[in-house]
């Protein structure tokens, strides 16, 4: 094991210049790992954090392509934006209860990640946090979770089921980004996703949220949901059973479009608006075709 006795790299202009092989052990006493500190280092396969560490900065370990495991310490509070993005060999993460902040895209494109256990106190999973983790099969969400950002799990094509905690209040809708990037639904193109449980308390099923989840077979929308967003379940080609409840008011365009296995649906009396294209190219008799729009 190789111990680094002193590391200070607060920004991209002062990046760590060490060549580190094997196991990187951050020494006791270190409280922060600065932005970009170890980004693009490809020589070490494991990282051990000290008990004193509080914060991992933005992009601190981004694109460390040999990194297979990280030992997160109790006492860690913050994981910055893109902190482990592109760590393509990382296989598993388990976050301690002390973590309250997980930055945007923190684990994006960790393509070998199989399991993420978030036993932390975070209330938000921010946009793109686990997007394109194509090997991810298991995700355990924190009991404190209230909000899941857009594209948080987009493209996690091996993910088969998700159980949301009762604390969940909202999924993020499609955001307007100033940089012009295309924003995707929270679970868009999770092509292996078969089972979901949406808890009472969620008021909106946001745009594109389960778009392209071609293995999803059934879904129950709780009575707290007022709106099903545009293209929310579009392209869910195996979806055959949808249970809607009183309380639902609006079904927007393409919400169940291109769902050929969906042949019947009961619309509650509480529904005030159904977009004419809500069920385009579905199996429901008389539903419009995409070429009609």
Regions found by a protein language model. Name each.
Residues 1-9, 17-32, 42-55, 65-78, ...:
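Structural signature of tandem-repeat unit edges
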Residues 14-18, 186-187:
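Short, conserved catalytic or adaptor-binding loops enriched in Gly and charged residues
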């Amino acid at each position: 094991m190789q111990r680094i006795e002193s590391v200070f790299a607060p920004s991209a202009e002062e990046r760590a210049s060490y060549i580190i092989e094997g196991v990187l052990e951050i020494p006791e006493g270190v409280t922060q790992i600065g932005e970009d500190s170890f980004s693009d280092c490809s020589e070490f396969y494991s990282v051990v954090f000290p008990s004193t560490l509080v914060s991992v900065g933005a992009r601190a370990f981004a694109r460390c392509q040999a990194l297979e495991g990280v030992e997160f310490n109790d006492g860690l509070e913050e994981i910055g934006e893109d902190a482990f993005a592109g760590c393509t060999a990382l296989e598993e993460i388990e976050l301690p209860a002390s973590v309250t902040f997980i930055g945007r895209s923190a684990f994006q494109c960790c393509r070998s990640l199989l399991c993420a256990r978030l036993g932390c106190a975070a209330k938000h999973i921010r946009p793109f946090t686990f997007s394109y983790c194509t090997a991810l099969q298991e995700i355990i969400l924190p009991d404190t979770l209230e909000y899941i950002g857009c594209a948080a799990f987009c493209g996690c094509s091996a993910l088969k089921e998700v159980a949301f905690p009762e604390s969940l209040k909202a999924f993020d809708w499609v955001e307007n980004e100033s940089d012009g990037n295309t924003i995707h639904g929270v679970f868009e193109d999770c092509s292996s996703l078969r089972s979901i449980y949406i808890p009472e308390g969620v008021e909106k099923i946001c745009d594109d949220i389960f778009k392209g989840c071609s293995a999803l077979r059934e879904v129950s929308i709780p009575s707290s949901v007022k709106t099903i967003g545009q293209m929310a379940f579009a392209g869910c080609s195996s979806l055959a059973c949808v249970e809607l409840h009183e309380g639902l008011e609006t079904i927007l365009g393409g919400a169940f479009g291109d769902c050929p296995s969906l042949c019947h649906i009961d619309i509650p009396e509480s529904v005030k608006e159904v977009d004419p294209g809500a069920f385009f190219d579905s199996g429901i008799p008389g539903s419009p075709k995409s070429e009609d729009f």
